[in-house]
């Protein structure tokens, strides 16, 4: 069991009996194409269906492009009540899409991401994604989730844009990755939020 307080803007003191998950992964075209399909049943916290796909174009030894897309839906799937509706926070009803483009050239790469999350204005967070196990960790798969908090962490529907270049040095052992993310959200308190990050790593 886990406590249901781990969603944004709320603290319903309700436990869940757990989560069931099922997924499939396909890779082809010499490992340059990938398709993933996943389903999660967060007991008492809704159902999440998710898919993403990516393809890589290797133009030369140093130059490559990656294109990716993702989509999903988050709802109650026949359950009339859950931890959020019982706490009068609205039903779970969300849809989301995202696209990502990455260019890699030798020691430099540039990552551009976009996400759109939407739902009923009467839903939790005006259509926010409910992900109890990733909230606060910035580990959800949205392309625009930055280091600190993304749309799921903010508990709101809306759009997000992210740009993140990466520079590598010393035969790829040193990596410097600044990032900028901006959010246009359905909830006024988060609208216009910007996050700047900088990650340095050495192997």
What are the residue ranges of the model-derived segments?
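Well-ordered beta-strand positions
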Residues: 25-27, 102
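A short acidic, glycine-rich active-site loop
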Residues: 7-12, 146-148
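Solenoidal tandem-repeat scaffolds enriched in leucines and small polar residues
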Residues: 13-19, 26
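Outer-membrane beta-barrel channel domains
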Residues: 1-6
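Outer-membrane beta-barrel pore domains
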Residues: 39-203
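Short, surface-exposed connector motifs at secondary-structure boundaries
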Residues: 30-36
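Short Gly/Pro-enriched turn/cap motifs at secondary-structure boundaries
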Residues: 12-14, 153-154
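Functional cores that coordinate and move charged inorganic groups
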Residues: 22-24, 37
């Amino acid at each position: 069991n886990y406590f249901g307080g781990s969603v944004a803007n709320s603290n319903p003191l309700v436990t869940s009996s757990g989560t069931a998950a099922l997924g499939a992964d396909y890779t082809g075209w010499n490992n340059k194409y990938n398709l993933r399909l996943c389903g999660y049943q967060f007991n008492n916290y809704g159902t999440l269906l998710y898919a993403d796909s990516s393809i890589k174009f290797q133009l030369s030894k140093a130059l490559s492009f990656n294109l990716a897309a993702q989509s999903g839906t988050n709802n109650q799937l026949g359950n009339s009540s859950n931890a959020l509706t019982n706490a009068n926070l609205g039903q779970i009803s969300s849809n989301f899409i995202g696209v990502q483009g990455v260019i890699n050239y030798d020691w430099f790469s540039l990552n551009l991401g976009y996400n759109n999350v939407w739902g009923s204005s009467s839903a939790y967070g005006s259509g926010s994604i409910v992900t109890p196990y990733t909230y606060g960790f910035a580990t959800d798969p949205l392309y625009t989730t930055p280091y600190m908090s993304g749309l799921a962490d903010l508990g709101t529907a809306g759009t997000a844009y992210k740009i993140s270049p990466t520079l590598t040095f010393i035969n790829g052992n040193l990596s410097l990755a600044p990032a900028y993310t901006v959010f246009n959200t359905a909830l006024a308190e988060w609208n216009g939020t910007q996050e700047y990050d900088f990650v340095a790593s050495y192997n």
